[in-house]
Amino acid sequence: MTTLLMLYPAYGTVSCHEVCRHAEQIDGLRVVLADDSPTTSDLDIFDEVWELPPPENVKDAYALLRRWCEKRPADGLFLQSERGILLGSLMVRDLDLKGPSVEAAHLCSNKYLQRVALQKAGIGVPMFSLAEDEADVHRLAAQFGFPVLLKCVISTMSRLVTLISADDQVDASVARMREALKKSLDVKRLVSFSETGDVDLGCDPTRQFLVESFLKGDMIETDGFVVGDKPFTFGVTEQIQSIDPPFFIESYLLPSECTDNEAIETVSDATIRAMGLSDSAFSTEMRTLDGQTSIVEVNGRLGWDEGFSELFKVRTKQERILQAQQLALGYEMRLERDHSRCAALAYRSCYYNGIVEEIPTAAELNGLRTETLQLGLATHRGARFLAPPDPEVYPHVAWALATHPTSSHAANEIARTALERLQIMISRI
């Protein structure tokens, strides 16, 4: 029987159970969960459950996985979470399995070395440099021009990203960043990966951080799979981001109607090659202005925003989580792009400290569904929302996916209207 090991698979509202459910479509498959917080219900869903240390403890988790896999070898590793890709790449190397190499996983996680590699390949990136104190940021801001961004070296899912618009904001912003780095589990995970795999990080993420110029232009991304070393892109997706607070996604529009999408996909393919990524999913965020495209970041995994599977299925007609499992096992994948419908995935969000008091029931949401509209929740009654700049902020409350025969922007209007009609109450605290 073929064994698929799922490593820290859950993210946000995507549960371990949902990821496992798709694997049930693969005949003769034994599914093993390796996670830091397995539940009793996991024992009923998975064929076997291994309890790992938290993801930031790569050293001990790696040692446990090595011992377990020596006794019960895996035929594939599902490495589609930020928490799992670094550790998983070490296991891919040791077990000679399909998946991202250690070097590629590192470049997709270490945003400093990622920018170095992209710049070397002639691909556009923001102006960037490492900093570790207020003096560095004042100097770099004078060089780059305001606004500038402060970012943790490792990908943090939009956490620890600070926009600085003026010189008098620098000192307080740097102080917050330095304090946050001391507590960051993402930083601990990167350092533990470096020590375990003998990987040179090119910097000290416990005290250094990125300072970047702020990229202007249309906000877009590409998502897809790298099969072997060949990228397959679902399409070019336009992002609509929040303004105050900035950087949170309000809508995804597929396809983008504001860009030369063929040229964008050419840049995306070159970016994947520069990362050396293979046999994995990818998500690449970009800015394009006056025909010039620059990379904001590259991730060597699936994007996990609520509704993403439904959004991309409009174009590919396939379930991407199942495809990622097939890819990990080296199975043939069905790859296609259907251009007959445009789509938009919109979110209703909460940007203040609050407690969810009232949300629609599943039956109420199902009653609103139509052939061209789907809705879902990203939270539950009693859940607490945090206000930015709290590093644990996650603002999505509900999502809506709408399709339209000719326009993703028209689909977005339909989705946003549906979201505003939902009866949701979040009390401020």
What are these regions (language model features)?
Residues 124-126, 147-150, 167-216, 245-247, ...:
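Conserved ATP-binding module of the ATP-grasp superfamily
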Residues 1-104, 135, 385-386, 392, ...:
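ATP-binding N-terminal substructure of ATP-dependent carboxylate-amine bond-forming enzymes
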Residues 162, 212-213, 256, 396-405:
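Short, well-ordered beta-strand elements within core beta-sheets of diverse protein domains
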Residues 89, 292-302:
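A short beta-strand motif that forms the metal-chelation/ATP-contact edge
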Residues 5, 120, 325-429:
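Peripheral (often C-terminal) accessory segments that flank ATP-dependent C-N-forming ligase machineries
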Residues 131, 161-166, 225-227:
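Short beta-strand-to-turn element immediately C-terminal to the catalytic PLP-Schiff-base lysine
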Residues 106-124, 133:
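Glycine-/Pro-rich loop/turn segments that contact NAD(P) or position catalytic residues
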Residues 168, 174-177, 213-277, 281, ...:
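ATP-dependent carboxylate/phosphate-activation module, predominantly the ATP-grasp catalytic core
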